[in-house]
Amino acid sequence: MQYTPDTAWKITGFSREISPAYRQKLLSLGMLPGSSFNVVRVAPLGDPIHIETRRVSLVLRKKDLALLEVEAVSC
């Protein structure tokens, strides 16, 4: 998945490899299936990635974002 600044993504679900504890943490931060997030900034080497949901602003590693099933949303 190529995350670039000023792109929007919709969460469709979670990967089967995600641990229940980490899944619960993401859910508590508002990363719910059906919700969307915007990519704010990408670090110079591509990792980590700054995203914003309706509730919070997060900085996640690529490997953590890979645990989310997402689809691009047209702005």
From Swiss-Prot:
SUPFAM superfamilies tied to this protein: C-terminal domain of transcriptional repressors
GO biological process assignments: DNA damage response; iron ion transport
Outcome of gene disruption: Reduced uptake of Fe(2+).
Single annotated GO MF: transition metal ion binding
Induction (free text): Induced by hydroxyurea.
Cited Pfam families: FeoA
Record keywords: Cytoplasm, Ion transport, Iron, Iron transport, Transport
Protein location: Cytoplasm
Signal peptide: none
Tree of life domain: Bacteria
Gene Ontology CC, one term: cytoplasm
Function according to Swiss-Prot or TrEMBL: Involved in Fe(2+) ion uptake. Does not stimulate the GTPase activity of the N-terminus of FeoB (residues 1-276).
Family: Belongs to the FeoA family.
Subunit (UniProt): Monomer.
Stated name of the protein: Fe(2+) transport protein A
Organism: Escherichia coli (strain K12)
UniProt gene name: feoA
